[in-house]
């Protein structure tokens, strides 16, 4: 009798027999393997932000004020924002809107529900931020503002969208360097947010809480110093920190200084993003300073730091809008840069979306489409890391995923249609995806 190849898959979900792959799903094995680390919400681990399915999330998105800052009660543009391939939207909201239309829009939580629903239906993580205390320096007012999240109606919404929601407690609140006594002010900053976090956790809120840097969001150094302590004091250790890169003065608009500030935050090993990145900064007048944002976003790409562009539309500085009228077809020159720049653009370098939002659950089988394209062929299959893809069309580059739906980096070997997977990703089962309907499974580990 001819000797048969040995089974090499460690999870008993794949049998290799005479070079063919037969997928045998063992329900309990898959359930235990896949769901053991699943949680009800987004959470953090060291620097990483993880989805409820345990997938790593690199937040790349856009800031947006739905309903035109409360002045257009029927205006929602999430469908248009989704065309940028953003995987998150930071949603501007108010506890108390101004008189007239904004007051009625923000007080009606069904409007917030509609915004959240549209956002998640488009596969984007909503980040609710309260704008009432922007650039203010009142700890007591900030604590009172954050209690808005624990009121019954808001908590119902948090529970409804808990699998895909981040709460940005307040926009750019409190001062540290600006007080003239940074050491004392950092203590106040940390104490204030400790109180807020404890209050919200005591009310049963478990989703990640995002904390903006002080000094109108610019002071990343302060977050680097107090962030580890805030994380430690959070009963759930589930905080994300956010700086806003209006760094004309803070970093001298200089890429070297930017790298130094970012390096300090990386050394602190805290999960952080740039919650606002823009091309122009206000001061005495609107749009006063041109910001050196491109080097910053290159650093973000190299260091795998998330960022969100300010702002989609209806900004007081029209040249700082991604879209001139809220439609994807009307991107400004700044918007074109943020969406299509070959080095860091949202569309040209898209971040993977939350697995839960892609599939509606954490079931690994929903990621695996067991259908093979007849025009694609992997040679050899199984392989030891290097393989060729036959059937590629002109200009096509294969995209490879593992069984968890995570994108796997491959390198071109220098010859046409020949590629290599790095050793850190193997052994394993992968598939090549070309467009929506063309895919082919293959195995990397070898036949013994």
Where do the PLM segments sit?
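N-terminal secretory signal peptides that target proteins for export/translocation
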Residues: 1-18
């Amino acid at each position: 009798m001819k000797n048969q190849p040995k089974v090499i898959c460690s999870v008993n979900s794949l049998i290799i027999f005479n070079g063919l792959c037969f997928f045998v799903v063992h329900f309990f094995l898959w359930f235990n393997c896949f769901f053991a680390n699943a949680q009800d919400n987004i959470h953090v681990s060291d620097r990483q932000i993880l989805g409820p399915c345990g997938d790593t999330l690199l937040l790349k998105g856009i800031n947006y004020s739905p309903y035109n800052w409360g002045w257009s009660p029927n205006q929602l543009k999430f469908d248009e924002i989704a065309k940028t391939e953003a995987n998150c939207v930071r949603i501007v909201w108010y506890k108390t809107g101004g008189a007239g239309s904004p007051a009625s829009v923000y007080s009606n939580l069904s409007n917030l529900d509609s915004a959240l629903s549209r956002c998640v239906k488009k596969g984007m993580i909503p980040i609710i931020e309260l704008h009432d205390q922007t650039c203010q320096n009142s700890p007591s007012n900030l604590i009172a503002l954050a209690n808005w999240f624990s009121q019954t109606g808001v908590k119902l919404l948090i529970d409804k969208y808990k699998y895909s929601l981040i709460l940005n407690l307040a926009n750019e609140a409190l001062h540290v360097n600006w007080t003239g006594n940074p050491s004392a002010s950092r203590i106040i900053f940390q104490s204030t947010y400790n109180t807020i976090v404890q209050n919200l956790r005591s009310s049963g809120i478990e989703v990640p809480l995002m904390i903006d840097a002080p000094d109108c969001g610019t002071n990343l150094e302060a977050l680097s110093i107090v962030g580890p302590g805030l994380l430690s004091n959070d009963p759930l250790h589930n905080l994300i920190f956010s700086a806003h890169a209006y760094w004309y003065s803070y970093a001298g608009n200089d890429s070297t200084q930017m790298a130094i500030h970012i390096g300090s935050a990386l050394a602190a090993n805290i999960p952080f993003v740039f919650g606002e990145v823009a091309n122009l900064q206000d001061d005495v007048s609107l749009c006063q300073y041109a910001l050196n944002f491109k080097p910053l976003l290159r650093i973000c790409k190299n260091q795998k730091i998330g960022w969100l562009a300010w702002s989609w539309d209806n900004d007081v500085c029209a040249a700082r809008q991604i879209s001139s009228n809220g439609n994807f077809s009307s991107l400004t020159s700044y918007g074109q840069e943020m969406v299509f720049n070959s080095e860091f653009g949202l569309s040209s370098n898209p971040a993977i979306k939350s697995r839960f939002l892609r599939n509606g659950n954490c079931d690994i089988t929903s990621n695996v489409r067991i259908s093979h394209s007849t025009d694609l062929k992997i040679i050899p299959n199984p392989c030891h890391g290097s393989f060729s893809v036959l059937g590629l069309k002109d200009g096509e580059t294969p995209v490879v995923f593992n069984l968890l739906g995570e994108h796997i980096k491959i390198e071109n070997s220098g010859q046409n249609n020949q590629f290599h997977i790095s050793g850190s990703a193997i052994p394993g089962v992968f598939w090549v995806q070309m467009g929506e309907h063309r895919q082919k499974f293959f195995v990397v580990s070898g036949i013994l």
